[in-house]
């Protein structure tokens, strides 16, 4: 069961918890890797707590498995949550679940990710599609690459109310962003995730022997004690943490971080080009207005009818400012990669200091 609670305050939403034991998203995301996998999650709102009871994937169009068609499959899967055919499919699935007495209400959707690379326009459009009808819906992100390291990577997000209002207006200009004080940190609101094990798994974990609490172990008094309580070895520690090689996930994250920084600078260069074009056109308009005022002054001196001074609106056309949304998403993705690199370097730095200590002469 997956639960999410949210309390309403005067200015912001305060998320509480999400817990998940439904393995449909994880299996679907892992089997579809590296293609993006999306699906719907259903449940109910129980006294402010969203309980996720089931999940099912969206049907996708079969394409060739070659590299030339992989991007097409990813694009189709990324746009699946807001496709008309999948909306009808989702409603039909919810109707069937209710027929078998399953608490099934639309509470969000899930998607897969690779090394935290999920903050894009398609993700925003999908979440806005769900959240505009129900502000309690969440986007569940399962990072398959991070989960392959042994620790489940499952995160939940909502769009902030400020970003929802700005996205509804469709204005992401410099003036509107300065007026609303909206930054890239205000795009998403993360909901903490708590994973609950099933009863069978909990029972199995309790059966795993633990190391002795004290160094002195009482000896058995008889042979019957040995037969009744045979010695069980505890779980062995992992020696992979002693590997001195650089984590390949750290290298890949650094590559993705550099790509995001390049995309951010490309968007910044486009905006600077727009500013240069705007300054050039405004200078031409100022020159034209100065010339027209001089002509009108001469015509008034000659007792002639002055020419219209607003004719520049027909002669000149100011360039349209590009949307700053893509730049905000790139900045948010750069922050995401930076946090991942910071998490990786904690263990890498320890290994580097250990190697340095062994290399230095005593």
Swiss-Prot record:
Name the record gives this protein: Eukaryotic translation initiation factor 3 subunit H
GO biological process assignments: formation of cytoplasmic translation initiation complex
Domain MPN residues, every copy: 12-163
InterPro entries listed in its UniProt record: eIF3h, eIF3h_C, JAMM_MPN+_peptidase_M67A, MPN
Subcellular location as annotated: Cytoplasm
Domain of life: Eukaryota
Record keyword Cell membrane present: no
One cellular-component annotation, GO: eukaryotic 43S preinitiation complex
Subunit structure, as described in the record: Component of the eukaryotic translation initiation factor 3 (eIF-3) complex.
Function: Component of the eukaryotic translation initiation factor 3 (eIF-3) complex, which is involved in protein synthesis of a specialized repertoire of mRNAs and, together with other initiation factors, stimulates binding of mRNA and methionyl-tRNAi to the 40S ribosome. The eIF-3 complex specifically targets and initiates translation of a subset of mRNAs involved in cell proliferation.
Keywords: Cytoplasm, Initiation factor, Protein biosynthesis
Organism: Chaetomium globosum (strain ATCC 6205 / CBS 148.51 / DSM 1962 / NBRC 6347 / NRRL 1970) (Soil fungus)
Keyword Protein biosynthesis among UniProt keywords: yes
PROSITE patterns found in the cross-reference section: MPN
GO molecular function terms listed in the Swiss-Prot or TrEMBL record: translation initiation factor activity
Lineage: Eukaryota, Fungi, Dikarya, Ascomycota, Pezizomycotina
A Pfam family of this chain: eIF3h_C
Similarity field: Belongs to the eIF-3 subunit H family.
């Amino acid at each position: 069961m997956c639960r999410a609670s949210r309390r309403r305050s005067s200015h912001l939403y305060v998320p509480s918890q999400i817990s998940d034991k439904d393995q449909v998203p994880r299996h679907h995301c892992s089997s579809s890797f590296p293609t993006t996998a999306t699906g719907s999650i259903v449940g109910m709102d129980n006294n402010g707590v969203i309980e996720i009871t089931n999940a099912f994937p969206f049907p996708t169009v079969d394409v060739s498995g070659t590299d030339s068609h992989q991007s097409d499959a990813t694009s189709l899967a990324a746009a699946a949550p807001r496709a008309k055919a999948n909306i009808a499919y989702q409603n039909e699935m919810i109707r069937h679940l209710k027929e078998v007495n399953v608490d099934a209400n639309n509470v969000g959707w899930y998607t897969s990710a690779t090394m935290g690379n999920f903050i894009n326009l398609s993700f925003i459009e999908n979440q806005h599609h769900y959240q505009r009808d129900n502000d309690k819906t969440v986007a569940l992100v399962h990072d398959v690459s991070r989960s392959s390291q042994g620790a489940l990577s499952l995160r939940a997000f909502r769009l902030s109310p400020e970003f929802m209002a700005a996205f509804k207006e469709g204005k992401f200009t410099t003036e509107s962003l300065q007026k609303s004080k909206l930054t890239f940190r205000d795009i998403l609101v993360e909901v903490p995730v708590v994973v609950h094990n099933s009863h069978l798994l909990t029972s199995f974990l309790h059966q795993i022997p633990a190391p002795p609490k004290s160094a002195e172990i009482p000896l058995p008094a008889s042979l019957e004690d040995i037969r009744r309580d045979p010695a069980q070895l505890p779980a062995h520690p992992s020696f992979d943490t002693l590997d001195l090689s650089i984590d390949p996930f750290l290298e890949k994250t650094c590559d993705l971080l550099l790509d995001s920084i390049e995309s951010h600078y490309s968007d910044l260069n486009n905006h600077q080009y727009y500013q240069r074009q705007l300054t050039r056109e405004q200078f031409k308009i100022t020159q034209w207005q100065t010339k027209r005022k001089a002509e009108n002054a001469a015509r008034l001196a000659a007792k002639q009818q002055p020419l219209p001074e607003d004719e520049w609106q027909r002669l000149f056309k100011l360039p349209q400012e590009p949307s700053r949304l893509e730049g905000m998403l790139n900045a948010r993705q750069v922050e995401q990669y930076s946090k991942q690199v910071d998490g990786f370097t904690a263990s890498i730095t320890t290994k580097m200091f250990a190697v340095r200590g062994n290399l230095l002469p005593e």
